[in-house]
Amino acid sequence: MAAANYVHTQGSQGTYSHRPIVWGTRGMVGGGTQLTAQTGMRILWQGGNAVDAAVASALAAGVMEPTAHYTLGGEVAFLFYDRSSKVVRSVVGQGWAPQRATIDHYMEKWGEIPSGVLSTTVPGVISALLAMLSEYGTMSFSQAAESALNFAGKGFPSYQLFVRAIGTADRMANLRKHPESARIFLPNDRAPELGSMFVQKDLARTLSLMVQAEEQALGQGASREAGIQAARDVYYMGDVARRMVKALQDLGGLYDYEDFAEYESPMEGPISVTYRGYQVFTNRSWTQGISLLQTLNILEGFDLGALGHNSPNAMHLQIEALKLAFADRERYVGDPNFVDVPFDGLLSKEYAALRRTLLDSDKARASYPPGDPRKMLAVDPSYVAPTRAEEAMAVGGDGDGTTYLATVDSAGNMVSATPSSFGALAQGMVLGDTGILMNCRGCYFWLDEEKSQFIATPEASQDHAMHLHNLERWRTLYDTWNAWW
């Protein structure tokens, strides 16, 4: 079951909750919607493990949660704790920019990265989910995709957030720019009605093609893993890939078939720090997880518990610590395939102690300079403050946040995943008749090679983590930057 935020009420019999903590003995699933969580629980009831449940939930959420900035045209940060080996696994779920999307090309034609199709990246979510399913799951793609296919083909009830988000004036205007998008998301040229069944036949057809490819492979004697690969190939190398590329090109995008066909999601080791007896893991620096770890290192020097939960003093310290971490993020953090990220220095306790000296427990600062984790300096002496325009560009984005899911099975395996498709619904680009609503993650690139997030370096905005205590007690943590729970 999924545990929701709970509300305490004072009554004649003491304090009680209308939405109490939910306890499970054989597994738990938390997701962005009730149906997302139920999808994962159904997989656990059928004998699947935490990875099977997470993949199924993520596929279902990709159908039902475009208003939470997540579609099957997005990306995912995915961590898996293998209880038997007591090892945390990670997979790269962030797609790359097309090969023709160079700094010179953008500067020559636009002088910036325009919104829309020119700020997109190859979707990484399907690749990453199926890589994890193949390596650590037990089920087939068709089993994991059953609920998602059902929600796409037969529909799901339009819920309040879904209706309200689609119905905003700016989103409706952008959806109307694209006939395929308007046809799906604006039936009768208006937002879906509350409770009405929302059907996505094109998306169901795409998922069905993937299922059929797997079934054909299995029918020819292929292994479970080869069947999953066959399903993946439909999306990245087959007819669906070609139709997505054609749609992107028609929209003015810089994609070629090879941008999809050559994309892969490699496994990698996570990064981690300890915080007051807990070991906290995140994906590497293609996400912002490293900023969370730096923040925890800085905060470890304060007794937040003594200040009171969410007290002004405690919140002040957390906010200022985040600012310190973000300053280093802008200076040093990017795709480690292209940028020499000083992981050891950034994550060291010594460096955190140096950065902590800049924090005033009584006063807030608008921003901080980065430090120098290589030379162990609290402030980088070569730092030049950005212009006001650069600061505005660095903020960017849509403030609604994204979705999240967590699963744990009876064996103690667990998954923490943050799937996202930054700005997908806001830009409203459904790719032809595939039903895939495309991300706009590329808006986070810089057109300056001095920046660690320049165009060759995809940077994902989501951050999630998993933390373990003595590798026996477990929890998953999702950091939305305004509430830790």
Question: Which residues make up each language-model segment?
Answer:
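Active-site Gly/Thr loop motif
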Residues: 252-276, 356-357, 361-396, 434, ...
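Internal maturation/activation junctions in enzymes
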Residues: 6-7, 189, 241, 253, ...
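Active-site rim segments in enzyme catalytic domains, especially the processed small/beta chain
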Residues: 63-70, 74-81, 85-90, 246, ...
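Generic recognition of flexible, low-complexity loop/linker segments
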Residues: 66-67, 192-194, 230-234, 259-262, ...
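A short acidic/small-residue loop/turn micro-motif
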Residues: 96, 422-424, 485
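Short, well-ordered beta-strand elements
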Residues: 29-30, 90-93, 279-284, 291-296, ...
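Hydrophobic, well-ordered secondary-structure elements that form the walls
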Residues: 277, 295, 325, 412, ...
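Noncatalytic scaffold domains of N-terminal-nucleophile
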Residues: 2-38, 42, 48-230, 235-287, ...
